[in-house]
Amino acid sequence: MLKLKRTDPKAKKVRIAVNVMRARLTVLGFNLAVISILMTNSSVLSGGYRLEGFEIPIHVTVSVPLFLALGLAIVALILFIASSEMDETGIVSHWAMPLGEIAMYLSLAQTVTGFFGPYLMVLDTLQLATGAEQADFLQLRHTLAAIGAIAWLGAFYLGPIVTLIRSPFSNLTTAFLGITYVSLCVLIAWTTTLAYDLDVHLHAGLETPVPWSKGLLMPLLW
């Protein structure tokens, strides 16, 4: 049976060096830059929805994951900043730190989805002149898909799980963080599979929706 730690006023307070948070803020800055570039360059893809008020077509399989990535990155920024004490040292002592780290990892996973997924689906439609060229290209496509899948699995599962395992906070707090993480995973899976249905299946004339559970292993849809 899992034994929960009791809150003890004399217990040692969690104190995490502020440099740990700064390193994660650097990752978020890099991720936000990548998101901006991908949103700008999404117009190079063919197809998409033509909506009034937009000069370029909207690709749901690109836009939805990137908007999720942007929102999660901003949430992570807020949580990281809120986790540090407002004193001369700025030591991180609040459970907002690991929660922000989980949001950061999920944001990275959505950035991977917004890049690899749509481009790999476009590559599937490419037809080369000879069978040998097509076979070589197919091997290249599978290699890129494998790299994207590894990156996605690392960000969506490995990173958050390591954060929960290494959490310096009480078992009760860590359990709350775990429940929040699972809830976010389900919400993201449902949203991304819905976007996949809209942008791929409806355009292809297919009416059978993709089960939202496949969004928990998004590389299977690429």
Spans of model-derived segments:
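Short, contiguous, well-ordered secondary-structure segments
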Residues: M1-L2, R6-T7, R50-E52, I56-P57
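N-terminal juxtamembrane cytosolic/stromal segments of multi-pass membrane proteins
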Residues: M1-R22, V27
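The first (N-terminal) embedded transmembrane alpha-helix
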Residues: V20-N41
